Structure formats: structure tokens, C-alpha cells
């Protein structure tokens, strides 16, 4: 589950019209959300509030074994009037990342004119907000010692350029020396056709560059021609192929990093009609220096069910990795019955939706025309992209993932009264201590030497969020 501050930061991106999907850093977002989700390891309580449209606070307290906490503050120059802040109103899909629908590349708002001048209108603003830059400030203080202070600064320099500063400062409990600090600076440039990121970190003077290129029509040329072919039915894009890479170099430690990747995904135009393909995303990433490669395949089997798998292989060590996971969104029977009775839009269930994707007829819903069902699919895809609250907001979600070593993680997230609760468990093989191993040999004899590990619980935890 995302932290409340991460949720507010995503709302800032939406309000400033910044496309966070068009980035090499987000190449495997869908697979990571379905396969690499974390489970709570103890009891954690979060109290948050969006006290004004510009200011948010969060207080966190963790317990069980170690008591710690944090205090966070966030300020943005863009008013977040349309952002739900109460825990009972926040759509659960905003707090729980899952399968993410990618949309065709588009121009940032107020894109520079043909003569190269930037638009004067502020991002997300009105005529009275001329020359006002979208800015976000965020700081978090982690207590008790070792005290750590983290923060970030975001500023929209132009419709296509964004500046990001992130710092981390920590100090050991008994140390009298100056706190150690690290500053990471990023400049992001997005034209819709391609995205580039320049990075510098004070830790070992690390320099980095990331880039992503989208194959297909150029949104900049479409803007100059006064049209957008992606919006025309006869020329709608059905899929998107993106290629990118990243490179890092540190002159201090002589460290070099390099990776490249591909992503192929279906677009809404390929899945918005009843007889079409299932939405899916394929990725391939390569790290030549370490000899690692990884492929992922994610499928949206229904509006409430998604599957994902990943296979990794190292050509130097011949080690491999296999991971599979899924997520299932659920709605309460009372809410589901109310939706079915209020509008025919929700009369088509997940099984019927899947049947139509496979081209199978269902007599039970033949009374509804394709035109009646089409807005439902379009509206669903639109909501997945813009994260707007709709009556079909889910009540809970179950996530499960397992790898080739039978490490299993299960997560349930949902609402309990006015709280958003996240509960998870982790199971897997555990190495025995030398003492327990010696005792097992003495009790069972040499024949028990094969039992070097046992299987059991790794962690169990609960996280609770309340916001106002």
C-alpha cells in the first residue's frame, strides 16, 4: 500500500499534467506492482491529513519489537481541490498499485510553439496564474535515533522539463561528527515521443542518464498539423513499442552501470470494443555487464483480475529466477447489487467480459447491445489512467506471489469502517542455526543431514491508515 504522501505526490503529478508513465524508470511498473509488492512486517499506524488544498501532514508509529515513527510534511503550489483525502473516500486503486494501462504518447500541456517559446500559462493554473511554476516540497523526519531526515523538491521548469531534488541525511546515535548527507539531482525532459533523464548524486559523484523512445507517430508533428491521429477511430493506435536504456558512471569509485529494455503493451483502442484482445504488457530488460536478462508478461484477465510472471537468467552463473503472481479485486455484495440495479453499465460481470474478449456469445446478456457495454469498458480504462473515483470502486484486493524457491507472499488490503487496513504474511524456507542442526543430527542420526532448512513463517504484519 502506498503511503499517504506518495498518494499526494501522485495527485500532484496528475494536477500538473506530468506523464509519469513515459519514463524508463517506469518500464516494468505493472510487473513490479504484481510481483514485488511488500507485506507489513509488524504493526504500523498512519495518521494523515490534507488540512488545506496546499498542505498535508502524516504521523507514523511502528511497534512490535522496535518502537519508531516519523513525521512528514508536504506543500504544493497547486491546489489539490479534487483530491479525496478522507480514508473512506480515497479510491482503493489509488493506494494499491496494480495493473496499469498505458496510453498513447501525447504532448505535455502548453507545449512550446513552433518558434520555440514556452507557453506562459502555468501548469494546472488559470489566466491569473501566469508564470507560476508547479512546485512541491516534502520532508520526513524518522525517529528515534539513528535520526534520519529525507526530503524532496519538485519544480516544473517548463511544460516539458521538470527538476527533482532528493536528499537524505542521517546521524548515528553516539556519533558527534557532522551528519552524513546525500543529494540526488534529476532533470527530466518529456516530449511525448521520447523522454530523457539526467542524474547526479553526491554519493561517489555518480552521473547517470536514462532515455525512453516510443515507436510510432510523433505527437509533436501531430500538434503542428492541428490534429491527433491517436484520437481518430480510423487511425487509432492499437499497441505501443518502447525502447530505452540507462547508464551510470562514478569517476571516484570507477563504477559503471548499464542496462537496456523493451516494452510492448496494448493500448485502450485495442481493448475498448467487446470482441478484442485482453490487455497485456510484455517487457525485456538486459544488463550486459552482469550478464542478466529478465522478461515479464502481465495480463488483465478481467477488470478485477490480473496475472503476471517473470523469468530471469544470468548467462555467467547460469542462475535463473521464476516468479508468478496475481491480484483479485473484490466488491461487497451490497455495493455490487446496488450498482447492477442502478445502471446497466455494471450488469456485465467479469466472466461475461472475458467471454466477449474471446469472441464467445453469452445468451444471458444478449439483451444488451455492444454500444451499451462499450462505454463501460472505455470508462474503466479511463479511470485506470486518470484515477478518478467511480461507483465501482473496489472494497478490497488480494495479492499473491510465489517464486521457484517457494517463497510465498500474500497480501490483503481493504476498508474496515473508516480505516484502510493492509495485512500480509510471508512464508518460505528458513535456514536452521548450527545448534538446532547439531541437535537434529544427534536425535535423528546421520541420515537427517539432508534437512538443512525448514519451511515456515517469515513475517506477519498489519498496517492501518486513517486520513482526514
Curated annotation (Swiss-Prot):
<dbReference type="GO" id="GO:0051654">
    <property type="term" value="P:establishment of mitochondrion localization"/>
</dbReference>
<protein>
    <recommendedName>
        <fullName>Mitochondrial distribution and morphology protein 10</fullName>
    </recommendedName>
</protein>
<dbReference type="GO" id="GO:0001401">
    <property type="term" value="C:SAM complex"/>
</dbReference>
<dbReference type="GO" id="GO:0045040">
    <property type="term" value="P:protein insertion into mitochondrial outer membrane"/>
</dbReference>
<dbReference type="Pfam" id="PF12519">
    <property type="entry name" value="MDM10"/>
</dbReference>
<dbReference type="GO" id="GO:0032865">
    <property type="term" value="C:ERMES complex"/>
</dbReference>
<comment type="similarity">
    <text>Belongs to the MDM10 family.</text>
</comment>
<keyword id="KW-0472">Membrane</keyword>
<dbReference type="GO" id="GO:0070096">
    <property type="term" value="P:mitochondrial outer membrane translocase complex assembly"/>
</dbReference>
<comment type="function">
    <text>Component of the ERMES/MDM complex, which serves as a molecular tether to connect the endoplasmic reticulum and mitochondria. Components of this complex are involved in the control of mitochondrial shape and protein biogenesis and may function in phospholipid exchange. MDM10 is involved in the late assembly steps of the general translocase of the mitochondrial outer membrane (TOM complex). Functions in the TOM40-specific route of the assembly of outer membrane beta-barrel proteins, including the association of TOM40 with the receptor TOM22 and small TOM proteins.</text>
</comment>
<dbReference type="GO" id="GO:0000002">
    <property type="term" value="P:mitochondrial genome maintenance"/>
</dbReference>
<keyword id="KW-0812">Transmembrane</keyword>
<keyword id="KW-1000">Mitochondrion outer membrane</keyword>
<dbReference type="GO" id="GO:1990456">
    <property type="term" value="P:mitochondrion-endoplasmic reticulum membrane tethering"/>
</dbReference>
<keyword id="KW-0496">Mitochondrion</keyword>
<dbReference type="InterPro" id="IPR027539">
    <property type="entry name" value="Mdm10"/>
</dbReference>
<dbReference type="GO" id="GO:0015914">
    <property type="term" value="P:phospholipid transport"/>
</dbReference>
<keyword id="KW-1134">Transmembrane beta strand</keyword>
<comment type="subunit">
    <text>Component of the ER-mitochondria encounter structure (ERMES) or MDM complex, composed of MMM1, MDM10, MDM12 and MDM34. Associates with the mitochondrial outer membrane sorting assembly machinery SAM(core) complex.</text>
</comment>
Amino acid at each position: 500500500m502506498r503511503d499517504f504522501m506518495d498518494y499526494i505526490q501522485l495527485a500532484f503529478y496528475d494536477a500538473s499534467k506530468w506523464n509519469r508513465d513515459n519514463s524508463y524508470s517506469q518500464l516494468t511498473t505493472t510487473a513490479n506492482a504484481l510481483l514485488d509488492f511488500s507485506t507489513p512486517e509488524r504493526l504500523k499506524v498512519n495518521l494523515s491529513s490534507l488540512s488545506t488544498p496546499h498542505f498535508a501532514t502524516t504521523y507514523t508509529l511502528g511497534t512490535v519489537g522496535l518502537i519508531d515513527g516519523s513525521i512528514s510534511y508536504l506543500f504544493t503550489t497547486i491546489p489539490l481541490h479534487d483530491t479525496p483525502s478522507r480514508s473512506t473516500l480515497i479510491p482503493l486503486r489509488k493506494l494499491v498499485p496494480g495493473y496499469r494501462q498505458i496510453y498513447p504518447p501525447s504532448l505535455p500541456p502548453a507545449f512550446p510553439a513552433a518558434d520555440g517559446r514556452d507557453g506562459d500559462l502555468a501548469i494546472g493554473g488559470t489566466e491569473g496564474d501566469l508564470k507560476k511554476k508547479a512546485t512541491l516540497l516534502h520532508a520526513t523526519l524518522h525517529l528515534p535515533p539513528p535520526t534520519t531526515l529525507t526530503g524532496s523538491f519538485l519544480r516544473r521548469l517548463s511544460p516539458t522539463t521538470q527538476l527533482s531534488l532528493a536528499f537524505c541525511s542521517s546521524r548515528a546515535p553516539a556519533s558527534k561528527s557532522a551528519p552524513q548527507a546525500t543529494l540526488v539531482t534529476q532533470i527530466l525532459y518529456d516530449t511525448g515521443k521520447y523522454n530523457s533523464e539526467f542524474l547526479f548524486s553526491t554519493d561517489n559523484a555518480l552521473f547517470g542518464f536514462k532515455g525512453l523512445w516510443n515507436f510510432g507517430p510523433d505527437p509533436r508533428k501531430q500538434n503542428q498539423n492541428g490534429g491527433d491521429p491517436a484520437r481518430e477511430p480510423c487511425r487509432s493506435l492499437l499497441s505501443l513499442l518502447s525502447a530505452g536504456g540507462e547508464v551510470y558512471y562514478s569517476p571516484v569509485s570507477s563504477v559503471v552501470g548499464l542496462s537496456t529494455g523493451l516494452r510492448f503493451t496494448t493500448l485502450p483502442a485495442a481493448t475498448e470494443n467487446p470482441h478484442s484482445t485482453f490487455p497485456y504488457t510484455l517487457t525485456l530488460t538486459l544488463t550486459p555487464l552482469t550478464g542478466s536478462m529478465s522478461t515479464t508478461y502481465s495480463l488483465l484477465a478481467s477488470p478485477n483480475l490480473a496475472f503476471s510472471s517473470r523469468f530471469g537468467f544470468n548467462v555467467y552463473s547460469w542462475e535463473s529466477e521464476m516468479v508468478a503472481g496475481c491480484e483479485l479485486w473484490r466488491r461487497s455484495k451490497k455495493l455490487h447489487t446496488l450498482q447492477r440495479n442502478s445502471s446497466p453499465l455494471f450488469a456485465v460481470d467479469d466472466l461475461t467480459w472475458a467471454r466477449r474478449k474471446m469472441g464467445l456469445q453469452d445468451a444471458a446478456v444478449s439483451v444488451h447491445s455492444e454500444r451499451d457495454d462499450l462505454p463501460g469498458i472505455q470508462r474503466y480504462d479511463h479511470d485506470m489512467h486518470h484515477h478518478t473515483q467511480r461507483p465501482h470502486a473496489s472494497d478490497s484486493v488480494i495479492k499473491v506471489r510465489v517464486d521457484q524457491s517457494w517463497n510465498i507472499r500474500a497480501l490483503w488490503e481493504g476498508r474496515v469502517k473508516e480505516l484502510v487496513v493492509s495485512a500480509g504474511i510471508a512464508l518460505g524456507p528458513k535456514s536452521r542455526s548450527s545448534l538446532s542442526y547439531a541437535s537434529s543430527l544427534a536425535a535423528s542420526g546421520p541420515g537427517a543431514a539432508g534437512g538443512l532448512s525448514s519451511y515456515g513463517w517469515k513475517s506477519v504484519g498489519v498496517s492501518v491508515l486513517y486520513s482526514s
